[in-house]
């Protein structure tokens, strides 16, 4: 991790202690192709003195070979690491960079601007707290600008910095900047992004990136780095306790523990817990980790929980606090971002994976898809690559989840093609649907027939057996 600090040279122990206590901000750079995302990240690192000498020497040499800025230093090469990216002068994969300043630690996700790589962008944005959306001052808002903004809103990113880049190419015009700002605010009226900041920059020349530019005296705001260091992110772990069971650990007849990672909230020894979906209640007897026994476990920790009661707990179950239960349903409404070249169609079976739980499921209704240009709802019967829709899902068995708006981890799932095992889509739960709607459709079949039907569809998908639960 790159970092500039005087403490490194004088007191390494104090530096490490201080570094460990810093807030971590995960952010993403997104926008249309050639808006300057990779160059901006390179400029942030360069002007913050966070590039090692050997890295700088390598970039100087590579700029002469494959650079796109003539005789100037091509800072985009710091993050465009794939050979195909350098040859084409574009970003294809999601590139992650880690650095810190005296105020914060940062993880940057640099994502592709090309439409065909929108799925990579959605992947990069899924864990971020903030998004920098770049707009080329010469081109204004593009289709990908709208698509990426909508995906950021969909994924629950609350803070967006709109960086109007390449201001040097339009003579640092305040009028052009204001026009783009007004157009984006009009778009933002249809999005759920509560905090939007604007800053005019030139990533190539460094204007308003780390230091305030003298070339735009009309801009009264702060440079980009100041916003990154000071924007208040809600880090409070106030989410309800959620512990998806990944593995049942039974090394001998005397021990039975349940292993996994705490995805939200916290729990301590003696807490009364409920196992979902069964609803059975027990008490935490001990919490074990790699470092030994813990009194309390928090989000992000990998632990083993033991209980006082011998109750049935399996992989895919969710352990929660007694009175903070999650939804349990086999029918739900969700937003889908489709990532496969093969379209999503109604009633086709896929694997639906919620954390440690995988079931078979299908779309039994397309509510609508979203037109990226207008953000209006459009009727549809299928979903193509990079399209976004709201659908109703039918699952082979009940699963535990929260709404994505409430919990970004337990409210998310992926859709897997059963024949190729390719991740075909990503989903965000809106809400569960009424359970009695499900029961009405299965009254004509016994439980054995339903289970046999599920087994046939799981192991012989090429038979195209009808889902009896629909």
UniProtKB/Swiss-Prot annotation:
Its EC number is 2.7.7.4. Residues 31-38 are annotated as: G1. Signal peptide: none annotated. Residues 89-93 are annotated as: G2. PROSITE patterns: G_TR_1, G_TR_2. GTP binds at residues 31-38, 110-114, 165-168. Residues 165-168 are annotated as: G4. One of its GO terms (biological process) is hydrogen sulfide biosynthetic process. Pathway: Sulfur metabolism; hydrogen sulfide biosynthesis; sulfite from sulfate: step 1/3. Pfam families: GTP-eEF1A_C (PF22594), GTP_EFTU (PF00009), GTP_EFTU_D2 (PF03144). Keywords: ATP-binding, GTP-binding, Nucleotide-binding, Nucleotidyltransferase, Transferase. Heterodimer composed of CysD, the smaller subunit, and CysN. With CysD forms the ATP sulfurylase (ATPS) that catalyzes the adenylation of sulfate producing adenosine 5'-phosphosulfate (APS) and diphosphate, the first enzymatic step in sulfur assimilation pathway. APS synthesis involves the formation of a high-energy phosphoric-sulfuric acid anhydride bond driven by GTP hydrolysis by CysN coupled to ATP hydrolysis by CysD. Belongs to the TRAFAC class translation factor GTPase superfamily. Classic translation factor GTPase family. CysN/NodQ subfamily. This is Sulfate adenylyltransferase subunit 1. It comes from Francisella tularensis subsp. novicida (strain U112).
């Amino acid at each position: 991790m790159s970092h500039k600090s005087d403490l490194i040279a004088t007191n390494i122990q104090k530096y490490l202690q201080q570094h460990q206590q810093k807030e971590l901000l995960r952010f993403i750079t997104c926008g249309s192709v050639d808006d300057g995302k990779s160059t901006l990240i390179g400029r942030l690192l360069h002007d913050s003195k966070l590039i090692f000498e050997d890295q700088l020497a390598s970039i100087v040499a590579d700029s002469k070979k494959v650079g796109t800025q003539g005789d100037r230093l091509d800072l985009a090469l710091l993050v465009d690491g794939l050979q195909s990216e350098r040859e084409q002068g574009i970003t294809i994969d999601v590139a992650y960079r880690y650095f810190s300043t005296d105020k914060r630690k940062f993880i940057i996700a640099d994502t592709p601007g090309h439409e065909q790589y929108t799925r990579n962008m959605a992947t990069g944005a899924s864990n971020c707290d903030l998004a920098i959306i770049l707009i080329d001052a010469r081109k204004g808002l593009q289709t990908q600008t709208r698509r990426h903004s909508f995906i950021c809103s969909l994924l629950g990113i609350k803070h967006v910095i709109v960086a109007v880049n390449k201001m040097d190419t339009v003579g640092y015009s305040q009028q052009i900047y204001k026009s783009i700002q007004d157009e984006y605010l009009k778009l933002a009226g249809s999005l759920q992004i509560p905090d939007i900041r604007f800053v005019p920059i030139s990533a190539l020349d460094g204007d308003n990136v780390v230091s305030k530019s003298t070339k735009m005296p009309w801009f009264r705001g702060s440079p980009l780095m100041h916003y990154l260091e000071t924007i208040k992110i809600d880090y409070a772990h106030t989410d309800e306790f959620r512990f998806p069971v990944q593995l049942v650990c039974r090394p001998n007849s005397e021990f039975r523990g349940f292993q996994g990672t705490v995805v939200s909230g916290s729990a301590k020894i003696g807490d009364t817990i409920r196992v979902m979906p069964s609803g059975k209640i027990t008490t935490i007897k001990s919490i074990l980790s790699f470092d030994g026994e813990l009194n309390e476990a928090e989000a992000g920790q990998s632990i083993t929980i033991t209980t006082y009661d011998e109750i049935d707990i399996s992989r895919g179950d969710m352990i929660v606090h007694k009175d903070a239960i999650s939804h349990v349903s086999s029918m739900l409404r969700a937003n889908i971002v489709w990532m496969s070249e093969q379209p999503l169609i109604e009633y086709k079976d896929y694997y639906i994976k919620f954390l440690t739980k995988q079931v078979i499921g299908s779309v039994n209704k397309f509510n609508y898809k979203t037109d990226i240009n207008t953000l209006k709802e459009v009727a549809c019967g299928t979903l193509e690559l990079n399209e976004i829709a709201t659908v109703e899902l039918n699952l082979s068995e009940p699963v535990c989840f929260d709404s994505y708006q409430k919990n970004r981890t337990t409210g998310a799932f992926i859709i897997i093609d059963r024949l190729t095992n390719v991740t075909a889509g990503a989903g965000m739960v809106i809400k569960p649907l009424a359970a009695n709607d499900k029961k009405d459709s299965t009254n004509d079949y016994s439980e054995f027939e339903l289970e046999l039907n599920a087994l046939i569809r799981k192991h012989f998908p090429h038979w195209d057996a009808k889902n009896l639960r629909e």
